[in-house]
Design a protein with these regions (language model features):
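Glycine-rich loop(s) and the adjacent beta-strand/alpha-helix scaffold that form part
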Residues: 2-75
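Conserved flavin/dinucleotide-binding core of flavoenzymes
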Residues: 3-7, 58, 64-247
């Protein structure tokens, strides 16, 4: 039997069950489950997440894209290294109208996480990014802070500038055509595996922190993509299945 204690609306509750699966951010588990062995606790605390960010812009029309004959742009030297029109969704018999005079959504992103895009990192750090050779975990921690501290207005200014620079030959006017901007900041974006450049060579096989950290503790099992060290939906599903079958 396991026992879970939680607070809701200022009241303390306690639930008993035959088993519990901890499937949140694995680095938080040592703070939730105090009974963990020290080796497992230390392994879970090594869990790290890559920083990611997804930006969506709502446009009045997408006529500028049509006039330019494009649906998206790769722009590695700009703040976002790619942006494109969101693919219209089909639901059952519903078919969206592909009318350039109608509103559309544009997604701006840096694939594989913010740290992989040098221009965005440099600008977020005010021209002074982490020096080459800085341990990956330190880079991620510093970048996390920068992403959270950057004002929405700073992102908005860069978005308007980038879209205008690329789309203005097609008649795009950011003041007229941008209806709304949504920025999803994921400072703890997605699970990471080990990195041979920075991590100990012995972190392989059964000694991998993800493997050590996901060991069953009585009637408690551990899941989430962190438990696989992979940022894949399939990995999260596999770990969830494993955790459930271990109970």
């Amino acid at each position: 039997e396991t026992e879970v204690t939680y607070v809701r609306a200022g009241k303390l509750y306690r639930v008993r069950s035959k088993g519990t699966i901890l499937a949140g951010d694995n680095a938080m588990i040592p703070y939730i489950c105090a009974e963990l062995p020290e080796e497992q606790r230390e392994a879970l605390l090594l869990t790290d997440r890559a920083v990611n960010m997804m930006t969506t812009v709502s446009l009045r029309t997408w006529e500028s894209f049509e006039r330019l004959g494009i649906t998206g742009v790769d722009s590695p030297g700009m703040f976002y290294n790619t942006f494109n029109l969101r693919t219209p969704r089909h639901f059952g018999a519903y078919r969206p109208r592909l009318d350039p005079a109608k509103p559309a959504l544009v997604g701006l992103q840096s694939p594989s996480g913010v740290l992989h895009h040098r221009t965005m990192v440099r600008e977020l750090f005010g021209g002074n990014p982490p020096v080459p050779g800085t341990p990956l975990r330190e880079q991620l921690a510093a970048l996390r802070t920068r992403v959270l501290r950057t004002l929405f207005e700073d992102f908005e200014r860069r978005i308007r500038k980038q879209l205008a620079r690329v789309l203005s030959p097609g008649g795009f006017d950011p003041a007229r055509d941008i209806e709304a901007i949504t920025i999803n900041r994921w400072p703890h974006g997605f699970a990471m595996g080990t990195n041979a450049l920075f991590d100990p060579a012995e972190w392989t096989g059964e000694s991998h922190p993800a493997v050590v950290g996901r060991q069953r503790l009585g009637r408690i099992t551990i899941a989430n993509s962190d438990a696989a060290g992979l940022s894949l939906a399939q990995a999260a599903m596999d770990e969830g299945y494993r955790a459930a079958t271990e109970l």
